[in-house]
């Protein structure tokens, strides 16, 4: 059986505090994973401040400008190579952690009108659409728009800017929506990046 292990690389020796960034707004899959990491760091007596960014591009710039110590990025991000290929950045850790349940959501207590329906989604879970809405390829009356996160998609539906969203269960609850179809959790792999420099290994 194939096995390998990797030690987490801190950006500085004897670290006691960390500023960690990932994709927002509140209740993204990335934030859920960051909250899991925070519990692990707190168990090691490390104080963590989290920052949520509108895009991973903004997160990368914040890391390069030393506004965060670490950047948490899912491998589903279509431009994750921007982090790997940045000469100033170093991979600190790779791990797996599941997302919340994903599904297709609408506003509660509202009948869905399919004619000229607008569906919003982050690009990463867009391939789930044929599973969530089996007749989608043949429905010409659905307009698809891309947004920066699953949480942003849920917010747009709540605000009446869209009719449907591919979103996660946390964002669904936060924005008082309901699923009309569920896919389940995604077994996601994640990378943590920091700027190159002196690194401490546990």
Swiss-Prot record:
Record organism: Planktothrix agardhii (strain NIVA-CYA 126/8)
Protein name as catalogued: Prephenate decarboxylase
Primary enzyme class: lyase
Entry EC no(s): 4.1.1.100
Effect of inactivating the gene: Cells lacking this gene are unable to produce aeruginoside 126A and B.
Key words of the record: Lyase
SUPFAM superfamilies tied to this protein: Periplasmic binding protein-like II (SSF53850)
Gene: aerD
Single GO MF annotation: lyase activity
Catalytic reaction(s) noted: prephenate + H(+) = 3-[(4R)-4-hydroxycyclohexa-1,5-dien-1-yl]-2-oxopropanoate + CO2
Protein family according to the UniProt entry: Belongs to the prephenate decarboxylase family.
Described function: In vivo, involved in the biosynthesis of 2-carboxy-6-hydroxyoctahydroindole (Choi) present in the nonribosomal glycopeptides aeruginoside 126A and B. AerD is an unusual prephenate decarboxylase that avoids the typical aromatization of the cyclohexadienol ring of prephenate.
